[in-house]
Amino acid sequence: MKDKILIWLQSTLAKSISFIVLATSIAVAQEPDTEEATTEASVEEVIVYGIRQSLETALAEKRAKANLTEIINADDIGKLPDENVAEVLENIPGVQIDRSAGIGSDVSVRGSNQNRIEINGRSTTPSGVNRGGISFSDLPASLVRSLNVIKVPTAVMVEGSLGGTIDVKTYRGLKLEKPLRVVRVVSEYAENADQWNENFSATLGNKFSTERGDVGAIMSLSHFDKFVREDRLRVSPGVRQAADSQIDFDGDGLGDPYYRPGFGDLEYGLENRVNTAFSGSLEWQVKDDLKLYAEASYTDLNKQSRRQSMFLGTPASDLELDGAADGTYGVVEVAGYDVPMLTSGIIGGGIRNGRTDLSTDVDDPNDGIQLRSNNRAGNRDTQSYVAALGGEWDRDNLNIVFEVSAAGSDTVETAFVSVFQFNNPDAANFHSANARIRVPFEYELDDDVLEYGPVAGAVTDAQLLDPNYWSMFVTKDQESTFDNEEFAEKVDVTWFLDHDVWRSLKVGVRASQRSINRSRQSQVTPNWPGFSAADLSSYLLASPGDFFDFNGGANYLDNFLTLDPQKIESQREELRDILALDATGINDPLQGFSVDEDTAAIYVRGDFETTLFGIPARGNIGVRGIYTDQKASGNEVFTDGTLRDVSYSQNYTEWLPSASLVLAPIDKVQIRFGYASIMRRPSFNDLSPTVQYPLNIGQAVNVGDPTLQPTKADQYDLALEYYFRKGSVLSLGYFYKDLEGVIGKETVPGGICNPRAVDANAGDPELARPTCVVDGLDGVIVTRISPVNLPGGTIEGLELSYQHVFRNLPEPFNGLGVIANYSYQDGSRDLTFSTPGFLAGEDEAQEFPLNFVGLSEKSYNFTLFYEKRKYSARIRYTYRDSFLVSESVDVSNGQPLYTHDRGQLNASMSYNLNDTFAITLNGVNLLKERKVQPGVFANGPIARMSDSDRRISVGIRARF
């Protein structure tokens, strides 16, 4: 592989140099005549204090850059209750975030969540098998000096983003003018979890003068231990087909199809997150022209899941339910087609419609919802690091930067799930599926609130909390290990030119060696191993009993029993022994895979400064050539039932040109033009040749494709910026992205045999899934989901930004400032999705439009701040439109899942006791907005609904 890379480097060097020479020959050669030429080099790295100063320095840095970059500086970060990098980023135009358990977890930049996360310009590695880099939730905001979101890349930047590159800048010591010592202690109350959480951070740095040159040292520490709780309700949209329907919507005398509740579950989502993070930098100015440096960052995140869940099955009857005519129904219009859905009714009322073909061993012929409780005990333990050694040599008109770096992450994820079924304790066959007690449920959709709970009198809390009613159905024990690693070497050479147009020429090479390995231990008890909850009474835990208390008058199933997730984690080996599971776990070759990926890049960029038609102009033009060599290895079950090691290799070369131009027609106005060819390689999970068999029969089997090609796009930018006062700006930008293709999901119902899934209805002639055999193991035929290269499309948008500090207002209003951002994005995709034929008629499928994942049409944020010498305050409201979460997810029967539009209000205040100490008060999710996720269509039936904490914190900050 390395020989291929060396040959490629030799063959492409001449091409890259030729590109820049050609660009030089067509440039306009005139001297610049601007009075103040602002360049990137003119803005030094400084430590800033206060909201106003941080905004001013960030804006000056943005203005100086030739390529479009959004910047947020340290005190701007610290003045809001932002916990991690994702939450900081939602202040930026064109950026939207999503939250998990109320904490920022996913970021979309200009309609794409396929971004690249760097620390000081270097690669980071994820906790799992995705691309992009370190998880946003793993990187605390307290380590950050500044955040750069590069929307238009240059040739010297590492490829890998379709949205933007997010570069996290940490502190460095050589440019400190005085010692830096900042300590922050915060105590936070989480409302749903009803817990006080602790947060500590500190940054210490200094510059020392020695006989052998100046030395700058700085380090930042962060630690938090917090509980969060997000309760979730899931009700998958099911289908009542026309042949089984008794509801006539169009008056033709025939039953019509509609959406109705399918499988579901509810969950008390308690988590304990402990994060310890460190970053440090050591710089040595050996000589005036030579600097050496060493930098490192490290995070250690432990996320303990203490969730309790109740699985809600579907009624047994495949005919129309009793009382359906008494229900209420609604119709939504999608792409000109009317889609009917049930909006309220009793699900599973009566005696299975008076059927006489039930087997005689069914103890409870009443129809209704099957109840299965389970714990969600699991940990994610991740250690991530980034380290670099390098130097910078300045010699006359030559600058050389050389560096070696390493990034890695080691993750262990555990999951121990015990499932109990709500059964009749008096049944002779108590430990069996047929002893189940079915409970009719009330279903009601009311705007953006979903209600789903047992009919009054159908079941009592005393029964649900009696361990004698619960029979263990199955226990699943799983442990996954992820090892991510990347090594990189680069040399950048910059010539500063004595030329009328070209100011510098940068040439560089970079090589990287990337690997990811996943291994998994997996074991499962037989169905109905013969334990009741009473047999494991010392491990039991009752649910909190306050599910979705925000909706006080609604009906939900609040009370039930599960095994205690915390005890399971601490006594896992003991439980394995009780349940006759292997004490150390069993390696599952069908769940492991590895990907090795080597890259080599060569790049050339020319920076120019001139005039065009008498207008001062500056910018850059360049090209990046990148060679990729991949090998994906894993295991595969062939048609003859044998298990074999498999590996697939591929390589490809891409050329990525880019250019930026900044015009300054008058002193306070800039016009930006940008172009870049960008690419994103498939996620490692998508490249896996190993078939991933989940234990849950309701989940599809994911099958990777090691021949997937990268996604490529061309993007164009135009922006007008008016810097009307220091620290103030009004800007309007337009962007357009033309995607050659995207990687999406293809769903094939009944497309694969899963030998790991357990069918709860095995033996039931009505409900059991079709069976199969693979590798000598009995299995169940389930849905297959595979990644595929899908047609592309276009994304275009407008970004409007306004920032202003009011300086001449009368007291007490002097000190007010405002930041407002608005984004509009429009996606046009060369792909639709088909609903099953029940919507359009017999054996027909209806086509509906499908947008890009993570793209919200409209989003905005508005921040009002007030700063005086003694105190400051901020309040920020953010909003984003609905967006597509996934083209194909199990919760909506292999059809799309959306997130509804949502806003959030955060606020912060601080009061300076003296020059050293300040008291802080912060609030997050003050309006306690719920997350609502429709299935199938953006305005379809609610498939998921969740409620996360409102968090209030008090703290003290010291700066010495």
List the model feature ranges, each with a label.
Residues 736-738, 748, 756-887, 927:
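Gram-negative outer-membrane beta-barrel transporters
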